[in-house]
Amino acid sequence: MAPPQHLCGSHLVDALYLVCGDRGFFYNPKGIVDQCCHRPCDIFDLQNYCN
């Protein structure tokens, strides 16, 4: 498993597509940017944003 990392902008969106796949995701910029851009997050944090 990858270590937690900072994901911002297009890197964050690409990671969500990779993690969520066909399920898609809901994009709440404030929540996910606070969680994954300002602080490092891991795959489990990203899965919380999948549909």
From Swiss-Prot:
One of its GO terms (molecular function) is hormone activity. The keyword Disulfide bond applies. Keywords: Carbohydrate metabolism, Disulfide bond, Glucose metabolism, Hormone, Secreted. It holds the Pfam family Insulin. GO terms for biological process: glucose metabolic process. One of its GO terms (cellular component) is extracellular space. InterPro entries: Insulin (IPR004825), Insulin-like (IPR016179), Insulin-like_sf (IPR036438), Insulin_CS (IPR022353), Insulin_family (IPR022352). Gene3D superfamilies: Insulin-like (1.10.100.10). Its main location: secreted. Disulfide bonds join 8-37, 20-50, 36-41. It is found in: Secreted. Heterodimer of a B chain and an A chain linked by two disulfide bonds. Belongs to the insulin family. PANTHER family: INSULIN (PTHR11454:SF9), INSULIN/INSULIN GROWTH FACTOR (PTHR11454). Insulin decreases blood glucose concentration. It increases cell permeability to monosaccharides, amino acids and fatty acids. It accelerates glycolysis, the pentose phosphate cycle, and glycogen synthesis in liver. This is Insulin. It comes from Gadus morhua subsp. callarias.
